Amino acid sequence: MRKKRSAPQKPKVTYRVNGQIRVPEVRVVFKDGSQEIIKTSQAIKMAEQEGLDLIEVQPTATPPVCKMDNYGKLQYKLDKNDRDRKKKSKPTSLKELRFHPNTDKHDFDFKAAHLEEFLRKGNRVRATVVFLGRSIIYKDKGYELVERLTERLSTVSNREGSPKFEGKKLFVYFEPDKKKIEVHERMLAKMKKEQQNKEAEN
């Protein structure tokens, strides 16, 4: 089984600080936006006097650009941003279910419910209509099934483009819609509560 290739990770941002800055002079950008080229040793002393660190932010510039800041707080902020970025970039998996042009109502409802559940969990889904043997002559039934499925999943997703044929298979993709899912979840919770109240009355 072929392993999924993981996406390349961005290198963690690190800065040279105080004594790690080995160049003779640096360009210091002050909080008011002004800049000055001064000796590195002098810049470090100025930062220390303010209870701050001299941080090299543009090492490739000539001379390197530095600013005075609290390195611990800066690194904490960078780490937090990195964690947030990783959460947002978490890949969604693709779930697939297969149908046939003559899929009966029970089977259709069963599979559509599974696709809906996949979407509610944030997964992208693909529905494939498989045409076996001479059933390829019923392409219109395949398209009708896709339209029914699109309507059924519209409360939690958006269809990606138009359905496409590849050989004897008709593919259609759906992506989860967070706002729709939130509304759908609230509606389900309301219906469940109403049902519980009704049962309690009886």
Swiss-Prot record:
The keyword Nucleotide-binding does not apply. Transmembrane segments: none annotated. Keywords: Cytoplasm, Initiation factor, Protein biosynthesis. The keyword Cytoplasm applies. It is found in: Cytoplasm. GO terms for cellular component: cytoplasm. GO terms for biological process: ribosome disassembly. GO terms for molecular function: ribosome binding; translation initiation factor activity. Signal peptide: none annotated. HAMAP family: IF_3. NCBIfam families: infC. Belongs to the IF-3 family. IF-3 binds to the 30S ribosomal subunit and shifts the equilibrium between 70S ribosomes and their 50S and 30S subunits in favor of the free subunits, thus enhancing the availability of 30S subunits on which protein synthesis initiation begins. Monomer. This is Translation initiation factor IF-3. It comes from Chlorobium phaeobacteroides (strain BS1).
